[in-house]
Design a protein with these regions (language model features):
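Class I S-adenosyl-L-methionine-dependent methyltransferase catalytic core
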Residues: 1-170
Length: 170
């Protein structure tokens, strides 16, 4: 009998925002952020994307282009759909570079799809501490990965090695 594999239990709350130091490193690698397709005004106060799509906007139904930062909703099927969309938009050239923060669920289809296009991946040491407005920061139940899709894995390594192991393609 085959069992379905899944990541560690989720909190059920998709509104956990990226630690600012990770955002600063991603912004440095990308040279700015044109789009965050899974955001909120509160998160964008740190992200600083030129354009955001919120849950109300339905980022999956909107156009994606340029340099993208993405910390997708971790609940399924949203994470799968956002990662598939990023992989497609990057392969087609609409997205020119991207940094995506996800659980390090390397066994999943969505991780394999977007990870298969990544020029580099950072596996942070320890668990990142996500934040919410008005709440204490918290670490998730499993580790994360930051995947880089773009032309400059050397710059990604230089910025992200301070967070943990960085693996690049040859």
């Amino acid at each position: 009998m085959r069992e379905k594999t899944s990541a560690a239990s989720e909190t059920g709350d998709n509104e956990w925002y990226t630690p600012p130091d990770i955002v600063l490193a991603a912004r440095a690698v990308l040279g700015g952020i044109d789009l965050d397709p899974a955001s909120s005004p509160e998160a964008n106060a740190v992200i600083g994307a030129s354009r955001i799509w919120t849950a109300a906007d339905d980022g999956l139904a909107r156009p994606w282009a340029g340099k993208v930062w993405m910390n997708p909703p971790y609940a399924q099927p949203a994470c799968d759909r956002f990662c598939a969309r990023l992989a497609r938009e990057y392969a087609e050239g609409a997205v020119t570079a991207a940094c995506v923060l996800v659980n390090n669920a390397t066994e999943t289809t969505w991780f394999q799809e977007v990870g298969g296009q990544a020029a580099a991946v950072c596996f942070p040491r320890g668990r990142l501490r996500f934040w919410q407005p008005g709440k204490e920061s918290a670490a998730p139940l499993q580790g994360q990965a930051v995947l880089y899709l773009g032309p400059d894995p050397v710059a990604f390594r230089a910025e992200f090695v301070k967070f943990g192991i960085v693996v690049t393609r040859r």
